[in-house]
Amino acid sequence: MKNGIAIRHITQGGVIAAAYAVLTLILYPIAFGPVQCRLSEALTVLPVFTPSAIWGLTLGCVISNFVAVITGNTIAGVWDILFGSLATGVAAVCTYFTRKIRFKGLPILSMVFPVVLNALVVGAELTIVEKGFLDWSLFAFNALSVGAGQAVACFAGGLLLFKAVEKTKLGTLL
């Protein structure tokens, strides 16, 4: 029985990683840079349903950031592979641990972590790549613009996905 559970978690995480990477790369013109909105970030709600989403989201982010680096579609380069993916992974862990805190039935707090962590981390990495140091006014712009895109993806897309998964009972399969 334990092998069946392990296979299920590997499969779930792999499907989530693939979905994240594909959604990011299909829409790469709006997925990278100071003004960005990764629609794949709507998937950051999935740790509410399964811990497999933690590593799935992180791996999907690594894959999409790696492909963006080797194709020259990101200014953040290797830093985004390391720190952007780390921010996604930490946010996924936080989402998982706050999954039971609900406001009017919605995991609002769980969606705050991907927004704030990515705004701060990606905002800082973009600023350092652009300026060579942490210029606070540029950081504020980058963090706010990344955060705005994240907020759209997480609060609009993520919460819609949450309701769809919950309504269709797909969450019981995760």
Which functions belong to the PLM regions below?
Residues 2-55, 59:
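Hydrophobic transmembrane alpha-helices
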Residues 29-34, 42, 62-85, 89-90, ...:
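Membrane-embedded alpha-helical hairpins and interfacial helices in multi-pass inner-membrane proteins
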